[in-house]
A protein has these predicted regions:
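Acidic, surface-exposed loops and disordered segments
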Residues: 1-185
Length: 185
């Protein structure tokens, strides 16, 4: 297992997955890391939805794609899958009544991405969850799933074993990413 610092420095988004499902043990380890993410005042506003049924993931993927801007959809191949055919999909929702809800959900996603990487599992943060769950269809899904309409989407995470041919790009870090401040007005 890589050191924590190495995982944080080397993790990359994976967008090509093998068909086989991740193990229950690995999924539980990832979810444990997610549940232990910091949250404002320890209010723990996030909910993590776990979807592993291929047909449900396919339907949610098409729904997600419907929120892309038209000019992007027009530039994509017809068979483009925003969830990259991953066998596991996590949806991170948060209670909008908690002041730090988006930050809390983002920390959960960060823990998921890094825990997955430490286990050799590929992951990618997929956007448009907010748009999905702000919509009427999203509100209906929340009801179906037994959740309050107070939940909003922060993001999706796809998980799976990376395809053998998938290559990780070297991450270029901006030179001005960190600014040291040593004076005040």
């Amino acid at each position: 297992m890589e050191s924590t610092i190495d995982v944080l420095k080397n993790r990359r988004s994976v967008k090509s997955f093998k068909d086989n499902q991740i193990s229950k043990e690995d999924l539980e380890s990832i979810l444990s890391a997610a549940k232990n993410a910091p949250s404002g005042m320890n209010l723990q506003s996030p909910k993590i939805l776990v979807i592993q049924r291929k047909k449900i993931i396919e339907r949610l993927s098409q729904w997600n794609k419907s929120f892309y801007p038209k000019e992007i959809v027009d530039s994509l191949p017809d068979d483009f899958d925003p969830f990259y055919n991953a066998p596991t999909l996590l949806i991170i929702l948060v209670d909008k009544n908690v002041n730090t809800c988006v930050e809390d959900g983002s920390l959960v996603i960060g823990n998921i991405l890094n825990a997955a990487s430490s286990l050799g599992i590929g992951s990618c943060w997929i956007h448009r969850a907010r748009e999905e769950f702000d919509s009427l269809q999203g509100k209906e899904l929340l009801k179906v799933w037994g959740l309050s309409e107070d939940y909003i989407g922060v993001g999706h995470v796809v998980l799976g074993y990376p395809n053998d041919e998938f290559t990780f790009n070297k991450k270029e870090i901006k030179e001005d990413y960190v600014v040291y401040v040593d004076d005040l007005i």
